[in-house]
């Protein structure tokens, strides 16, 4: 009788172990799927935002977004871009003024956003524009994933080719042959989040 009891206990323990392993496998599979779905959702729901509140996002959030930018793909992993993360109001307004001068008006080209992430890249690397553009994409997607709005603002190239733009780089201690790729503005969205416009019909040409 004692042997039968021992056998039953051992069998129950084996069944419990198998059940736990199966449950863990199911849990891992379920936990992986939402992550994939969330990534796709972020890709499909990100929008360019042109209306912001004055509220400054937490520094740790900005740092995480910058980190995402550093993981963008670059040609032969040369990592030619750099990011200037501007949260200082005086510098932000200075860059806004320079950008507006290039644009030819007095409006704020940063749409009131409190944060500007300037992406530059080493022009001696032949993939510098592509590298910097991928960084910009990562920054905007990461901002959306963190609940912030973003927008790619052009004219970084012209700003940092100007004498004052070069002076800013010198003041920041940045040396090298860097060319501006883009300004990623960040902040909390003011007003309604914009809806996506319809996609054009001839986006993809299949070759099967």
Regions found by a protein language model. Name each.
Residues 8-16:
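Bacterial N-terminal signal peptides
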Residues 1-8:
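Bacterial N-terminal signal peptides that target proteins for export
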Residues 5, 18-208:
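Acidic, surface-exposed loops and disordered segments
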């Amino acid at each position: 009788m004692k042997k039968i009891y021992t056998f039953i206990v051992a069998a129950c323990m084996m069944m419990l172990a198998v059940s736990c392993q199966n449950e863990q496998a199911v849990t891992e599979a379920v936990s992986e799927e939402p992550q994939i779905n969330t990534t796709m959702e972020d890709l499909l729901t990100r929008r360019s935002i042109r209306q912001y509140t004055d509220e400054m996002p937490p520094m740790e959030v900005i740092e995480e977004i910058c980190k995402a930018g550093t993981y963008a793909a670059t040609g032969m992993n040369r990592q030619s871009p750099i990011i200037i993360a501007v949260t200082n109001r005086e510098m932000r307004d200075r860059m806004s003024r320079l950008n507006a001068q290039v644009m030819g008006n007095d409006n704020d080209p940063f749409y009131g956003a409190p944060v500007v992430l300037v992406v530059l890249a080493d022009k001696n690397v032949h993939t510098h524009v592509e590298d910097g553009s991928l960084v910009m994409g990562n920054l905007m997607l990461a901002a959306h994933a963190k609940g912030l709005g973003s927008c790619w603002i052009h004219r970084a190239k012209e700003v940092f080719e100007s004498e004052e733009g070069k002076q800013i780089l010198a003041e920041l201690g940045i040396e090298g042959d860097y060319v501006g790729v883009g300004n990623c503005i960040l902040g909390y969205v003011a007003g309604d989040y914009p809806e996506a416009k319809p996609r054009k019909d001839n986006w993809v040409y299949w070759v099967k």
